[in-house]
Design a protein with these regions (language model features):
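Aromatic-lined carbohydrate-binding/catalytic grooves of carbohydrate-active enzymes
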Residues: 198-224
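The substrate-binding groove and active-site-proximal loops of carbohydrate-active enzymes
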Residues: 184-189, 224
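Conserved, mostly hydrophobic/aromatic
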Residues: 73, 121, 183, 198, ...
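The feature marks proteins involved in alpha-glucan
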Residues: 1-70, 100-182
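Short proline/glycine-enriched turn/loop motifs at strand-loop junctions of beta-rich domains
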Residues: 10, 74-81, 90, 113-114
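Solvent-exposed beta-strand/loop surfaces of large extracellular or lumenal domains
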Residues: 87-105
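Short, acidic/polar
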Residues: 188-198
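Short beta-strand elements bearing conserved aromatic residues within extracellular beta-rich modules
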Residues: 81-83, 119
């Protein structure tokens, strides 16, 4: 569908889709500019863009006064990459992404997508095969065994460890006694304060089994 309007400036607008008696209005994802600068793209191509994690993946942001999520993934050999999720009925035709010419990064800002939304990338490769892939830079994933990515808001937690981080810089392990206590943190959910126990028994450090989710819950995370 296409329409040409006799206007010099692009006005604020919405699309409205009618399916029988159902009407759905939404923003146009393609009216928003790319959030990755040319300088950042050149640094990425040179292998020196050390903050790629701030742009690649899925990041809830405000763009042009509209809240949504910015998606970006590197897929240089793909013919097409689309975002599919519960916000577009998992239909790869609805949100094909922009391809950045130098790097092969595909990117798109999708208005209205919030933290908690499930998504994947639908990738069309040479030969016409279509695959769905999880986000390699994703910050959330559904509970195993699902591998579907989840949009996550990372800015909500306020760290309070500035003084401790400064003190840590002065620590030289080879000059002081070290006694390490290894444990699974889930064991301490039922047994009170771990820190109090460590101080009482004289341990200086603690080594946790993996605290992030791992695939085989019976493995204790040793293969993580």
């Amino acid at each position: 569908y296409a329409v040409m309007l006799p206007l010099k400036r692009i006005p604020e607008y919405r699309f409205q889709v009618t399916r029988g008696s159902m009407k759905e209005a939404f923003f146009d994802a393609y009216e928003y500019p790319c959030q990755i600068t040319e300088e950042e793209e050149r640094a990425f191509c040179a292998g020196v863009y050390y903050k790629a994690y701030k742009k690649l993946g899925a990041h809830p942001v405000v763009c042009g006064g509209v809240r949504g999520t910015y998606f970006a993934v590197w897929a240089p050999n793909a013919i097409r990459v689309s975002i599919v999720g519960d916000f577009d009925r998992w239909d790869g035709r609805r949100l094909p992404m922009h391809r950045m010419p130098m790097s092969g990064i595909f990117e798109l800002f999708v208005p209205g997508v919030k933290a908690g939304a499930s998504y994947q990338y639908e990738i069309k490769i040479k030969g016409g095969a279509v695959q769905r892939k999880s986000d390699p830079y994703g910050n959330g994933v559904q509970e195993a065994p699902s591998v579907i990515s989840v949009v996550a808001e990372l800015g909500e937690f306020s760290w309070q460890d500035e003084e401790w981080m400064k003190e840590r810089e002065k620590f030289v392990s080879r000059e002081v006694p070290v006694s390490v206590y290894e444990t699974d943190i889930t064991e301490w959910k039922k047994h009170g304060e771990l820190a109090a126990f460590l101080k009482e028994t004289g341990y200086t450090h603690v080594e946790f089994h993996p605290v992030m989710e791992y695939l085989d819950q019976n493995s204790g995370g040793y293969s993580t």
